[in-house]
Amino acid sequence: MINVLLVDDHELVRTGIRRILDDIRGFKVIGEAKNGYKAVQFSRQHAPNIVLMDMNMPGMGGLEATKKICRYCPDVKIIVLTVNCEDPFPSKVMQIGAHGFLTKGAGSDEMVRAIRCVHAGQRYI
């Protein structure tokens, strides 16, 4: 079972992703967070396998949350979800510890593929 934490300040986005993942055998959404602070807190308490992390959120954003989760929970793997796909942004998030990068326009098949790749120890860009 791949345990996933969804992090996005838009409830509609979290709900949509949850619906996709709930239909995939072997995936379980174990929590949701609407900002980076709650994502770090949840990750420290529950150690999800994968965090799907939005970058632009009020308060602590995705970059800072990714750094903190990588520091405190090195076994948790992070896939960044964002609308910003222009260089050097993908390289930057991978350098700070993210394991994967997806644009928010990616289809459900690509999201599932990214989660499986990252869970298997590979990087996904």
Task: Describe the residue ranges of each PLM region.
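C-terminal output helix
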Residues: 88, 106-119, 123
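Receiver (REC) domain active-site loop signature in two-component systems and cognate sites
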Residues: 57
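Active-site beta3 strand of CheY-like receiver
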Residues: 46-52
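Conserved acidic segment of CheY-like receiver
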Residues: 1-13, 17-21
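Short hydrophobic/Thr-rich beta-strand motif most characteristic of the beta2 strand and flanking loop
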Residues: 26-34, 42
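Active-site residues of response regulator receiver
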Residues: 8, 54, 82
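Acidic catalytic/metal-coordinating carboxylates
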Residues: 35-38, 61-64
